[in-house]
Amino acid sequence: MGGVTYFERDFDFDEHAREVDATWDPRVGGGPAPSQSVRALDDGEPGNLGTGDDHRRDPRRPSAADDDVSTTSAAQASAWDTFHGTHDSGVFFKERRYLLAEFPKLCDPDVVKSVLEVGCGSGSSALPVLAANPRATVLACDWSANAVRCATRAVERAKGLESKDRFEGFVSDPSTSDDLAGEVNRRLTRRGLNHGLDAVLMVFVLSAVPPGEGTASFLRRCVAALRPGGVVCFRDYGLYDLPMLRFPPNQRVGERTYVRQDGTLARFFTLDEVRVMFKDAGLVEEVAAAGDDTTREPVRYCCVHNENKKKGIKMKRVFVHGVWRKPLG
């Protein structure tokens, strides 16, 4: 972990939810107390999470939420491509080294030899996996060609990383592409990995997929690419995460769904919601193995304080975390 300590139970979710329910109305907005209304970055996630102060715009321009087309898959692909083109240096992102502690299977070379990261962005998730698991091949797809270029360049420039040819990026949108499984299998076969895909890494990506059939198709196609017995490692924004409370009402386009000023989508999930989505996609929740921390539920809210030490402010971040397995039968 490189000396980085990561906590996921900095505060109690139920207590946090009661406080929010008593003070916040999504139809009115208002967000947290003014002292907390600062730029909110999650640990290792880009600042595009912000609602307004992270993405400057002309105030005379109509809100992106006023345009229904902004929530289509094609519009989202375009918005994210523009975003990654603007931030193609990669300095806007931090490596998500905490994923190695949250998903320890990814580090085990005897268990995981092939990983598909869906929505690879700048490569901030792929890099720690490649460094921790010397036998893992990481395929990484994104609907943004700029993101794929950024991730590929980050791997090529990574210091101390051996066998950089273990990474391969490609452009694909699982919500619309019928051939994701074929694409993955062909790339693995060319590398002599004929046993199939061991793991799908799905980190801060489902929140960018339009809800409804787009999400269902996205999950079905990712599961189709996975071998029986393989796992999906999932982490995304959760109910009452700080940025959700900061969005103004005119950027709300659905239940717990918002459009940022740059046109990118932001969704915030409940535990029940993700359980239903992954079950409908044909997956089962992973059970704790011998030696695992049995005090942590397999599917849970991770409650993290992000601290701005300069201003002495703690920001309450809520993420949904879970691991699902594809049945053998």
Where in this protein do the model-derived segments appear?
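N-terminal auxiliary segments of SAM/dcSAM-dependent transferases
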Residues: 1-73
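Class I SAM-dependent methyltransferase SAM/SAH-binding core
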Residues: 114-181
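A short glycine-rich, Lys/Arg-flanked "PGG" loop and its adjoining helix->strand segment in the class I
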Residues: 216-231
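C-terminal alpha-helical "lid/dimerization" subdomain adjacent to the S-adenosyl-L-methionine
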Residues: 238-308
